[in-house]
């Protein structure tokens, strides 16, 4: 199959960090490994992208960048859209801000086929944007598990938990800086964050792949998420996760190595510290269980179980 993936007008793979660009690149590598041909379109000029698309003559086009949604009606091939916006949840739509008019209202107008990263995202498109359920397909993110080293020894930082994310308002890291064993890695975009407290700097990707496994568990207590890649990366490195209720997409929250902090307890630092400690103790002692769980999120599995069957349904059903 020939697939064109439309991404943001940025380098793919990314030079540094860039979750969407990394996801697109990992999808390409995994699809090609499975025998498919993949074209990445990330030119800032839509006319140039249409020219390249026409020359490639894809069987399917996948728009993976919100601001290119207006291209959808003009694409003469079977097509679907995926958005990575953090607040696409019926109960969080009041946080959309300018995104609503710029992007979400375009979904309401165009009503495209959607490959949603979670069921809650698809529910939002159905009930708020008015998109028919037969145009909504679940399509979770995947992870390149083979990129991650997994230690078979006692982790170097056995008693540390790691908050690995861009340090910003949505991720809320500054709230938890009184938790003594919680460390932070990521570029800083929030002046409320105190760099003198357990800050590890910004990690390069290769450093992440080699060193994530040396921590006890991962923390992600943001106030909005789509399907956070960092949780899948944690599992691939053998770590359990402590997450907010907005970061639970596609996860089995009954697992003992997945701890969900209710939003009404997000300011209860003593409670959160206790939950992080409990999760860390369990996770360090049950790494094989976590690694087994992580296999369902490997890209080749996600593509085989969701992505390619979804494409076939769109093509065969002539859904547009």
Label each PLM-derived region with a short phrase.
Residues 223:
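Aromatic "clamp/platform" in nucleotide-sugar-dependent glycosyltransferases that forms part
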Residues 240-244, 250:
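Short hydrophobic beta-strand element within catalytic cores of glycosyltransferases
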Residues 115, 153-171, 177-181:
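Conserved donor-binding/catalytic core segment of Leloir-type glycosyltransferases
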Residues 3-4, 60-63, 72-93, 115, ...:
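Active-site proximal beta-strand in glycosyltransferases
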Residues 105-135, 145:
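A short, active-site helix/loop in glycosyltransferases that binds the activated sugar's phosphate group
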Residues 87, 94-115:
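Membrane-proximal helix-turn-helix segments that form the acceptor-binding/catalytic region
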Residues 91-92, 126-127, 135-159:
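Acidic anion/phosphate-binding donor-loop and adjacent secondary structure
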Residues 19, 270-319:
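A charged, aromatic-enriched C-terminal amphipathic alpha-helix characteristic of glycosyltransferases
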């Amino acid at each position: 199959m020939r697939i064109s993936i439309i991404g943001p007008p940025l380098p793919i793979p990314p030079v540094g960090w860039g979750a969407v660009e990394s996801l697109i690149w990992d999808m390409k590598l995994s699809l090609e490994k499975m025998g498919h041909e993949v074209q990445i379109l990330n030119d800032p000029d839509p006319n140039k992208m249409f020219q390249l698309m026409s020359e490639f003559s894809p069987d399917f086009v996948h728009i993976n960048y919100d601001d290119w949604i207006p291209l959808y009606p003009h694409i003469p091939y079977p097509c679907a859209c995926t958005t990575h916006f953090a607040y696409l949840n019926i109960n969080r739509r009041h946080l959309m801000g300018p995104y609503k008019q710029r992007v979400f209202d375009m979904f309401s107008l165009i009503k495209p086929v959607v490959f949603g990263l979670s069921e809650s995202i698809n529910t939002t498109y159905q009930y708020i944007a008015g998109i028919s359920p037969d145009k909504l397909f679940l399509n979770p993110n995947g992870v390149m598990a083979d990129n991650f080293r997994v230690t078979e020894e006692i982790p170097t930082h056995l008693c540390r938990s790691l908050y690995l994310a861009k340090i910003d308002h949505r991720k809320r890291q500054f709230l938890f800086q009184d938790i003594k064993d919680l460390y932070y890695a990521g570029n800083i975009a929030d002046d409320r964050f105190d760099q003198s407290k357990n800050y590890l700097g910004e990690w390069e990707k290769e450093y992440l792949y080699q060193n994530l496994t040396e921590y006890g568990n991962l923390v992600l207590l943001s106030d909005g998420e789509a399907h956070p890649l960092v949780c899948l990366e944690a599992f691939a490195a053998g770590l359990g996760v402590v997450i907010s209720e907005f970061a639970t997409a596609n996860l089995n929250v009954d697992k003992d190595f997945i701890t969900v902090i209710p939003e009404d307890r997000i300011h209860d630092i003593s409670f959160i510290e206790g939950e992080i400690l409990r999760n860390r103790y369990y996770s360090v002692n049950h790494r094989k269980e976590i690694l087994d769980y992580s296999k369902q999120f490997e890209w080749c599995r996600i593509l085989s179980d969701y992505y390619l069957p979804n494409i076939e349904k769109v093509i065969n059903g002539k859904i547009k």
